[in-house]
A protein has these predicted regions:
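PLP-dependent class I/II
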Residues: 1-129
Length: 129
């Protein structure tokens, strides 16, 4: 047995908590927050960010934004777009390692207020004409 499959005290208690009634309630609450965040992001992107496309994620809380049309229309590279988001405090991830030439990955596993704040910043400072 290696240390990768050995259970320590912390992981044992985490496992017990995860399968408790409270753990199930927490997962239900988490799923509701994630669904709210995903629906909000998809609607806002479709309505406010022309040239950016995204599909509803399946089994994850990561969005994969296709910025190909937006970058082309605004004569920006994906690097410039990514840096613009980071400059206003939106930390997102380059999509190229995930086979998206002009894509950005965005994590939505945050409180809804933070997701709204991030998209307001993107709308006001990054995805502008």
């Amino acid at each position: 047995m290696t240390h990768y499959n050995a259970m320590n005290v912390l992981s044992m208690h985490a496992l017990i908590a995860a399968y408790s009634k409270e753990g199930m309630e927490w997962v239900d609450q988490l799923r509701a927050v994630l669904e709210t965040n995903i629906s909000y992001a998809l609607t806002l992107i479709q309505r406010e960010f022309p040239g950016v496309s995204v599909s509803r994620p399946q089994g994850t809380y990561m969005l994969f934004l296709d910025c190909t049309q937006w970058c082309s229309a605004h004569h920006q590279t994906i690097e410039e777009l990514q840096k613009a988001g980071i400059a206003v405090g939106v930390i997102w991830q380059d999509g190229r390692p995930f086979h998206g030439a002009c894509h950005i990955r965005m994590n939505l596993a945050l409180p809804h207020s933070r997701v709204k704040e991030a998209f307001e910043r993107l709308k006001q400072y990054v995805f502008v004409d």
